[in-house]
Amino acid sequence: MKANHIRILLLVTIAIMFISLMGKWEQTFPADNTKQQTSATQNNSHYDNADSSTNTDVTITDAKSSLAKETNFSKYDNAKSITINTVVFKDVKVSLLDGAIISASLKDYSISLDDKTPMSLLTDKSGSEYIAKSTIVVNKQPISVNFEDQGIKIENSKQILTLTGSADGLQITRTYTFDDTKYNISVSQNIKNTTSAPVNVIVDDSFARDFDPAGDSFSLLNAHSYTFTGVAYSTAKDSFRKESFKDISKTNGQPTVINSDGQGWVAFLQHYFVSAWIPQSTNAKIYYKNLNGDVFEAGAFTGATIAPNQSENISSILYTGPIIKANLVDLAPNLEKTLDYGMLSFFSEIIFWVMNHIHSLVGNWGLAIILVTCLIKLIFYPLSAKSYRSMAKMRMLQPRIKRLQETYKDDRQALGKKMMELYKEEKVNPLSGCLPMLIQIPIFISLYWVLLESVELRQAPFIFWIHDLSMKDPYFVLPVLMGLSMFLQQKLSPAPADPMQAKVMMFLPVIFTFLFASFPSGLVLYWLTNNLISISQQWIITRHYQATHKK
């Protein structure tokens, strides 16, 4: 295959393959969960397996009925609630009905650039409810507990809310511990059996969310549509799995149950943010399902048999906040994997680590992107220089190549042979010009995911009109400049001998400009910076080579 064919193929690969393949990989080809998952048909109910001493069967209909009651959002409308504020949380509302957390806003993350109101990650807003709850289940039936507020105690930098309640012969004391500067909430409950018989109890820590999966559709020209919205979980056997809400909605309401085989966690995952329940027991079960069409539920339940006049302590950690690796890595094994940079995550993590350190020095993510690009070009300069020297040599050989094409225009086989002899004689590799593009492909894809998934770059400004590097350029200035830089770079490269190839190459800057118009402006900034540095390097090397090799 000719060098220009390969160059065109590489350019198209960068522009199209990574968009259509990388952007949709996890959604189009989800991991096979069948080995570790058990459907509701096999287990009758996700409550059946919570405790090995419980053998009574529960029908699927009974399970659906109990779950539907748990996600009756309107029951919290008239219930009293306690409001807590911390350094990172605004208006965390804990309902006295069942102790559900029905609202939590994040002070450091506004809704948008225009609306500086703290975004509500958990919310009781009608039509978009998203709550975290801890339900007590007795003999496979969820019970409703009307808690009483025992006040908030402050210890060091922590606020401890205590609720007490009783139902079905159980006395329940639940505490919520808020660390002022952290997004994790410790939820601990002491359950005492005041009856004369043993009681099988389940604590079901779960999320319920009203979400329309039809609105979560993929668009080639919307980079943010490539992000994931759905359930994520981790067990001893499966370190990290995801299931989109769209796929869960196709399960006809049947819950999927996973045996954690040790400590695991379950989460609702969305762009930039995650809410996760982390049970502290080793016998928890994890489940997720679709309820009532657009309502989704996922949770982890822990079972215990409590003897008469005895009590059991069951604890969990609730995290609801931004996906920041430093916040997650110590909370639970593999929770940091919710920061998913895709198939090239190894390179993405290195790029982000370098960018983050540069940002700590310069204070601007746009400058950090430019400096990272300069650093990458410096690291790969020896390879690039070799490639540009080869391209300069190819450029000087163009007159001889044209003469060969005229001489052997009717004999393509002879032309190919003579061309190879010429390349061998002059010690030039016609494919070496493709090397810079080959190097860029993994870096481009890795940086793409860093810009798309790192919450640190959400609403991060650069200069002038670029107010958010994670969003497209509102005036398309950077994409146009990037297209012009590609056009200029082509002028420095050897012209394709084939007229058709030449026309295709001429149109590529236009195609790239159109595609990049919808990409995050930070990514376009990287590509523009990379092109400008490449142009400078190629121009200097080409002039030097021509000056020292004139015949």
Swiss-Prot record:
It is found in: Cell inner membrane. Residues 33-55 are annotated as: Disordered. It is a multi-pass membrane protein. The keyword NADP does not apply. GO terms for cellular component: plasma membrane. GO terms for molecular function: membrane insertase activity. Its main location: membrane. GO terms for biological process: protein insertion into membrane; protein transport. It holds the Pfam family 60KD_IMP. The chain crosses the membrane at residues 3-23, 361-381, 431-451, 504-524. Interacts with the Sec translocase complex via SecD. Specifically interacts with transmembrane segments of nascent integral membrane proteins during membrane integration. Belongs to the OXA1/ALB3/YidC family. Type 1 subfamily. HAMAP family: YidC_type1 (MF_01810). Required for the insertion and/or proper folding and/or complex formation of integral membrane proteins into the membrane. Involved in integration of membrane proteins that insert both dependently and independently of the Sec translocase complex, as well as at least some lipoproteins. Aids folding of multispanning membrane proteins. This is Membrane protein insertase YidC. It comes from Francisella tularensis subsp. holarctica (strain LVS). The gene is yidC.
